[in-house]
Amino acid sequence: MRRKTEAKRTQILEGAARVFEQRGYHGTTLNDVAREVGCSKVTIYNYFESREDLLKAIIVQGSRPTMGYLAAALQGEGSLIDRLKTFARTYLILVMNDYSLAMMRLMIAESANHKFSQIFADGSEHDIWQHVRLAIEGWTRGCSPSVDAGELSKTLRSLLHGGSHFQCLIGAQATPQIDALLAEADTAVDLISTRLNV
């Protein structure tokens, strides 16, 4: 058996992501991935047990750096509003890149398959929204009236996914300039800040 290398693993992940984006999960075979990468199917099996395992690795690899940036934004200095704005700006910029949009389109296209949906849930950004909820809870603990941190976290997520992100996702517009994205993120936080009592 040949020695595994991180470079080959990355090459397989990048090639597979391109094929999944073009053909969807069910339209992609490991032979397709092997052709795209320029290797044998056996080589792919040396790194990944199945097509499902390969997709999970793509999702995890794609989300890992994102989660680090976002967690750092929430743990930064300043008021809750300042930290949420930094988070929202970072989040919106990260989810508007071509790779993130392609993975979201794939998730939507294959969402009728429960097993496939679970792959995305296990490897995606769900955990970061728990961090948002906890940041809001920590800052607003003891406020009167009480604040539903979970609901505010969901509202922020909906606002960030509902504007330019949705329009780009469906192909109705090109990715906006960075200043427009930053303003959109700030507006989303401003909208939920009225319910924060801070």
Predicted regions and their residues:
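Helix-turn-helix
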Residues: 11, 15-53, 57-58
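Amphipathic alpha-helical segments that line or abut small-molecule/effector binding pockets
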Residues: 14, 81-97, 101, 105, ...
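Amphipathic alpha-helical linker/stalk segments
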Residues: 56-87, 138
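A short secondary-structure junction motif
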Residues: 61-69, 98, 114, 131, ...
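Amphipathic alpha-helical packing segments from all-alpha helical-bundle domains
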Residues: 67, 82, 93-94, 102, ...
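Amphipathic alpha-helical segments used for helix-helix packing
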Residues: 95-122, 165-172
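Hydrophobic alpha-helical bundle segments that form small-molecule/ligand-binding pockets
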Residues: 114, 126-153, 173-176, 194-198
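Hydrophobic/aromatic-rich alpha-helical bundle segments in the mid-to-C-terminal region
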Residues: 140-189
